[in-house]
Structures are given as C-alpha cells and as structure tokens.
C-alpha cells in the first residue's frame, strides 16, 4: 500500500487533487464523552456556570470543521457547503453521543472535517464542565460514513 502523503524521498507532501473531478461529498463521524451522572443532569438542566454547554459545543464543532486545514498539516482547505452537529444525551450510560455531518462539492473528501468537528465539540464539553468533573472521558471517535469521489461509499457497522 502506498501512502499518498509521502513523496519519492519519503518526505511529507500535500496530495495534488487538481486533476480530480468535483463531486458531491459527505462524511459522518461520531464520538462520545462519558461523565458523572450529575454532570450530565446539569448539562441537561442548563445549570453549568459557563453557559449552554451543547450550544457552545455545537458552534465550536462547526468552527473546527471549517478550520481543519489549519490544524491538520496535509488537509486541503475545503469550502464546506454544510455542517451539522447533533447531540444525544444517554442517561443510562452517563454520556453524550456526538454526531457530525459535513458536506461539500469538491475534489477531496470531508472525513477529517467531520472527525475534527466531533473531537472539538467533545473537547468543548470537557472544557465547560471540567470544574465539576475532571473524570470525563472522550472516546469512540470514528468515521461512520463517507460518500462521493472515486472511492465511492464507505459505511462502518456501528
């Protein structure tokens, strides 16, 4: 298997996508943040002192998707045509599940943007709640769907 981000001399490079066709592309990523039940209850009730945790995390995730190429060296700057971050509060398992759907029409996919959006949304939740719960765990961040481009559809069984 050849790594596309490595040149003939073994050095890092940004892949040239100029000859690729523009296609409609979408990526879906998910992740979770586990916390104490009291923390989850307070997020749900809106009693975290720093403000509306999920609203801030949603905006942070969208901003992160838009700025992925500034954080991941070999990512291309992409015009994102849509980004949605959603949250599901799971009281039974004391966690918040996070989902990011990112869309574009372009020459390269938005997988890294979706993964970055989920990660930064989770980090934002952690940041806003760390004063009351330093035991939070961010985990299970993964790409679950990718469509468009030459490689077509990818779906992970979850």
UniProtKB/Swiss-Prot annotation:
Superkingdom of this protein's organism: Bacteria
Gene3D superfamilies the record matches: Molybdopterin cofactor biosynthesis C (MoaC) domain
Keyword Lyase: yes
Binding partners and assembly: Homohexamer; trimer of dimers.
Record GO biological process: Mo-molybdopterin cofactor biosynthetic process
Keywords: Lyase, Molybdenum cofactor biosynthesis
Family, per entry: Belongs to the MoaC family.
NCBIfam families xref list: moaC, PRK09364.1
InterPro entries: MoaC, MoaC_bact/euk, MoaC_sf, MoCo_biosynth_MoaA/MoaC, Mopterin_CF_biosynth-C_dom
Catalytic residue list: 127
Organism for this UniProt entry: Thermoanaerobacter sp. (strain X514)
CDD domains, per database record: MoaC_PE
GO molecular function, one term: cyclic pyranopterin monophosphate synthase activity
Residues that coordinate or bind substrate: 74-76, 112-113
EC numbers, comma separated: 4.6.1.17
Catalytically driven reaction(s): (8S)-3',8-cyclo-7,8-dihydroguanosine 5'-triphosphate = cyclic pyranopterin phosphate + diphosphate
Pathway where this protein functions: Cofactor biosynthesis; molybdopterin biosynthesis
A Pfam short name: MoaC
UniProt-recorded name of the protein: Cyclic pyranopterin monophosphate synthase
Protein's job: Catalyzes the conversion of (8S)-3',8-cyclo-7,8-dihydroguanosine 5'-triphosphate to cyclic pyranopterin monophosphate (cPMP).
